[in-house]
Amino acid sequence: MVNTMINKTNKSSLDVVGIGNAIVDVLTTTDDSLLKRLSFDKGSMTLIDENKAKELYEITTNRIQKSGGSVANSLACISQLGGKAAFIGRVKNDKLGEIFIEEISSTGTIFKTPTSSVGPSTARCLIFVTPDAQRTMCTYLGASVLLEPKDLDLSIVREAKILYLEGYLWDNPAAKNAFIKAAEIAKNSGRKVALSLSDSFCVTRHRKSFLTLVEDYIDILFANEEEITSLYKTSNLNFAIEQLKKKCELAAITVGKNGSILISNGKEIIIDPYVLGKAIDTTGAGDLYAGGFLKGLSDGLSPVMSANIGSVCAGHIVTKLGSRSSADLSNLIKLHLNINI
């Protein structure tokens, strides 16, 4: 089997480069009645067009606008933990694009992808957070779908210890081609390739392609229970895990308040959750889990310790509204795991 550990003597100047949708999150708190009126399934992610995005924006109140996107959130976490990260994604040169660039750059994450001057506006995700901390997302992908192979900074892809890919990109053919090109370059450069399945509906749309992708390119897989069971067309999590063991060396399956299941060298290891306060918003839990996990791996730590780092980061972010935190994450890791990263 391929060794998924990162050699501590690796002198790469970059820990992780991520490719994903460059999105601005627009968060608002609401109750179940609004979701029912809008015919949204609580906890789901729905793709919407620009007109619908404008309509929903107008009915939201007490908005919090933050740079977002699943992989971008993970990279921001890595940077906050002292890692060196870079992001590849497309925004337009509009107001939301400025917000995205300013905030992702403020975390220390490298962002050099050229902006679009024409075409769709910057992507946004309207996130409705209910009192039970569930988030229902409506996403307008906008300029993010314009990502194509020529946008790749090949030197960065070759340099980073880990390439992290966002499953949502599979919805757009040009972005999908960029995705595959980056994975091939990373593998040919001796780097590790990680994938987030992103969303159960995304998995359903592209199940066959994802299964091939996991088998051919992926060293590290992130998914939640709904996504991994969707991948293997089953309602039985244990069955899905057994299938995954045959195809993937290292995977982390998050199971909400029950923590996560680490799959490493064919073994299952339960990673307990870290409850660091009352959960008020689960928006960034999976993203920060992946960020902490990848930071640990890039430092040469074991998969178990890396998963625990991810669990602490996830346990912290659910106590905040949104998917970014200004807290000293490294200090939290030292406090709860007694290690310095």
Identify what each model region corresponds to.
Residues 162-242, 258-260:
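Conserved beta-alpha-beta core of the PfkB/ribokinase-like small-molecule kinase fold
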Residues 75-84, 128-130, 296-299:
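Alpha-helix C-terminal capping segments
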Residues 112-116, 127-173:
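Conserved phosphate-binding/catalytic loop of the ribokinase/pfkB sugar-kinase fold
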Residues 103-120:
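A glycine-rich helix N-cap at a beta->alpha junction
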